[in-house]
């Protein structure tokens, strides 16, 4: 099933948090890279891997998933985001995000907005960590997660491929 063939909402509904499935996808990715390495080595074709850059700051998660106990807290976050988020004091926004993340530490949307708060404070190191956590916990992983980037780095090293770290060049 291809996303372009489906209604957007239907496509998003098909994505659910499934750590087992995620590990299987990562294993398949590793195996695909290994097979590419064998074929390119046999054909004496050089390989250049490019670590993909991503827009951390201006691209929220495609899908976040709330779990049962955190539902009311997450609803408060959703209401706050829809009703004058930036008109609220930074301390209030941070407290709400901390409450959400305490209840649901893997809630990507809260991690993303926590990054926005860190940015607003000028704490760019913690902002980058929060934004990356939002990518890593995105239910619809259309951007490279840390584990995907690590797999690429490992294979570049293992098979002596050239590696371009595009994010570090930006």
Task: Please annotate each region the language model reported.
Residues 4-154, 158-159, 166-170:
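Serine-dependent acyl-ester chemistry module
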């Amino acid at each position: 099933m291809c996303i372009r063939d489906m209604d957007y909402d239907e496509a998003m509904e098909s994505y659910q948090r499934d750590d087992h499935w995620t590990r299987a996808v990562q294993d398949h990715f590793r195996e695909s890279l290994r097979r590419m390495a064998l074929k390119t080595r046999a054909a004496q074709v050089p390989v250049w891997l490019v670590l993909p850059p991503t827009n951390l700051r201006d691209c929220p998660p495609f899908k976040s998933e709330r779990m049962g106990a955190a539902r009311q807290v997450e609803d408060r976050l959703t209401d706050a985001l829809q009703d004058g988020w930036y008109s609220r004091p930074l301390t209030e926004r941070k407290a709400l995000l901390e409450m959400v993340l305490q209840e649901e530490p893997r809630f990507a949307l809260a991690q993303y907005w926590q990054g926005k708060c860190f940015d607003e404070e000028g704490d760019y190191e913690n902002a980058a960590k929060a934004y990356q956590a939002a990518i890593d916990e995105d239910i619809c992983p259309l951007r490279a997660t840390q584990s995907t980037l690590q797999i690429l780095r490992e294979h570049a090293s293992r098979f002596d491929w050239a590696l371009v770290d595009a994010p570090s060049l930006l």
